[in-house]
Regions:
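Short beta-strand segments
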Residues: 1-29, 37, 43-48
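Short beta-turn/strand-loop junction motif enriched in small, turn-promoting residues
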Residues: 3, 50-52, 86
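Short, solvent-exposed loop/turn segments that connect beta-strands within catalytic domains
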Residues: 19-21, 53-56
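Short histidine-centered beta-strand/loop micro-motifs
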Residues: 25-26, 35-37, 87, 108
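Short acidic (Asp/Glu) patches
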Residues: 27-31, 41-49, 75-85
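Charged, gly/pro-rich active-site loop segments
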Residues: 54-123
Length: 123
């Protein structure tokens, strides 16, 4: 949601922190969407495979909140992100964390498949 209450979509490369189950993405500090993202912002998105094939509906939908990184976490997060996206080291920007709260995975091949959902425990 931007500063005037309108939805804002953007494409990005991502990584994952398996230890904490955080989704990671990097964005330039002066991009429109970075200016609208603050810690504890609600966020939603989709992740699709690199190759889209006709008659296949495969991917995930997620929602969560953005988190700030403390210095101890920052080094590990940067390492995880740059292992998956090594060329992005040369691009200035900030790596953001998303605490995933809900995921729905769709795996349909030629019309047949399943949907799997996961939701963070509220305890």
């Amino acid at each position: 949601i931007d500063l005037v209450g309108k939805p804002q979509c953007f494409n990005c490369m991502y990584g994952f922190d398996f230890e904490n189950n955080y989704l990671l993405f990097k964005s330039s500090n002066d991009s429109y969407h970075s200016k609208n993202i603050t810690p504890n912002s609600l966020i939603a998105g989709t992740i699709l495979p690199n190759k889209l094939m006709p008659f296949q509906n495969i991917g995930i939908q997620f929602n969560g909140i953005t988190l700030s990184t403390d210095q101890n976490l920052k080094e590990r997060i940067n390492t995880n992100y740059y292992i998956k996206n090594p060329l992005s080291i040369a691009i200035p920007g900030k790596i953001w964390l998303i605490q995933l709260n809900k995921i729905k995975m769709t795996g349909k091949l030629k019309g047949f498949g399943q949907k799997i959902t996961w939701e963070r425990s509220t305890n």
